[in-house]
Each structure stands twice: as C-alpha cells, then as structure tokens.
C-alpha cells in the first residue's frame, strides 16, 4: 500500500508491505519523528487506522506537533505509552493497519527486570513486535536511536530481525535530508529519498539535482559536475577540490562525502600518470551540499577537479564529467550512461566528457558526449 509520501515509497521498494517491520534510525533532531508523523497521517487517510505510539512525548505534545504541520486525519490514533503489553492491548482494541513506535529504546516488557533501552529489552520487544506484525498483518515502523558513531543503538540482532533498515541522514543545520535503505527484503537498497526541512515539516524534493546545484559557483577552479546514479535515480552533484601548498611536513588529505582511500589512490594516479606534483600539496575534496558519492563513476570528476584547482583553471560551466579511473591512468566504462546524460541535459548542460568505451556507435545522446581513454587526455581536454 502507498504511504502517501512518494519519496518514502521509493526507498521502501514501491510502498508499505503489510506485515513488514521497518526500523528507521538517524541522528537526534534530524526529523525521524516528523517523517513518520507525516507518513502516518497520509496512511491514515489512504489506507485506514494508524496507531502512533510515542514513548518520548505526551499525546498532547504529539497532537500539537501534528497541528503545527497541518496534519489532519480522523483515523490517526495517538497513544503515549512505553509498556509493550499495554501497546499490544491497544492494537487488539483498535485494529490498526499500521503501527508506529517512537522509539524502540523507550519501550519495555514488564516481566523483564532490565531497564528500557537495554540489550535484552530491545531484543525482546523487537521480537514481540515482529510477531505482532506477522500474525496480524500490520505494517510496523520502529524509530531507533543511533550511537555517536552513527550506528543504530542496541543489539545487532534487531537489524537482522527486521525486514527493512532505513537511515535518515543530513546535516542538522542544512535544509535537506536523505533517506537511505541499508537493508530491504522487499526492494532495492540503492534507492534514496530526498526531503527538505521547512517550517511546515518535511517537503519531498522530486528534483534533487537542481537543489544540490542551486549554489554552485560559476568560473571557480576545482569545481566539477558529475551525474551519480542512486539506484534508478540520477543525481547531479558538484565535486569540489582545493589544492594548496603544504606547510607542515606531511601533506594533508581531507575528504568529505567521497571515499577517502579512493581519493588518495586518484591523487597518486594524477602524480604518476598526469605529471601533477601533489606530494607537497594539501588536498581537500568535498561533495557539495553534504551529499555522498562513493561510486567509481566519480573518479574522473575528482581527478579533474584536483587538476583544475592545482592549475587554477576552471572548467566550462556547461560540462559534466563521468568515468572510472584505473591505476594505469585509463578511463573505464560506467553503467547507466544514457540515464545520467539525460538528467544532465534536463538541467541545461550541453557537454559531457565520458569514457570512450561507454559510447555506442550511432547512438543519439541528449547532449554532446566526448569520449576519452586516459586521464591525461581528459585533463588536456578540460583544463589544458
């Protein structure tokens, strides 16, 4: 059944599966409760009764938050309770189609002596809620706390038990949020959902590429656009590099949003194959907007951005760069080229530098695609 939140449905694999147990984690204040409250109201209007159980707020507080978000649904039932036996009794009495428990760390079983949030309580409560979902055929959503390292708090057995594990990510001081699946028995784990946090709650972002590029500087050295592929969704991202002389012995390598080891490998290839001396340079690489991009198709963009920053030579503003780079400096083929180029063309880009081996003879692409075989060739073409 559809949740009424298209971005959530995309990540879940097309919609909410009756009888499924979904765990959603994220940093405090990131918007987990807001997302599930909005989804609960939409589900209540579309599919029938939803029981929203809050162990962290009173029913009056949840009601106030729902009113502030402009949510109205007569079938949305709010319960402030932490004892699981009482929650089960309310489920039996109200017979909801969907149950939301916010959060699993606040719920406890009365016949266990340990405190709520302990390993035994989380494990046993998770097992009971799984049984409730399967026997009654209701979809159950659990909110989970995370540790300082960003992993879900509690026993790992909980993640093995549930059908789907979602992470809600983003910078607390930024406006956008990304919902990712790291486990999904009913769909792909490659899809993402993008939201924007506003005064009226979370707003879906159907075109995240435009949002990520909204503040892109034009004519700046070290800035390169690439088209990432998250599942079936293409995303245009700005990869930035800053190369400066090192003043303290060992040069620094700082990476945000990309894979650190891969960036170090690309810098070594730049020095060996393209003759750019980086051993005395600090290099900082960032995926703008706090996004993440760890696929090999970003290799060429990272390398070109570093070369651009080193030489203080900006790229043309209407070009996107795609390709995997091998240790010998060759540019390797990537998948989903046409999908990526179509997204770039839709946002006004007219040129693309891509692996020559990815181009199909006679194919008609939505923009001018130039093939390259080596990193040195790409750098010569783009930054001279």
Residue map of PLM features:
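Peripheral, non-AAA+ core regions of ATP-driven protein-machinery
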Residues: 1-12, 17-25, 30-37, 46-49, ...
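Conserved Walker A/P-loop ATP-binding site and its immediately adjacent core
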Residues: 55-62
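Conserved RecA-like ASCE P-loop NTPase motor core of nucleic-acid helicases/translocases
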Residues: 50-54
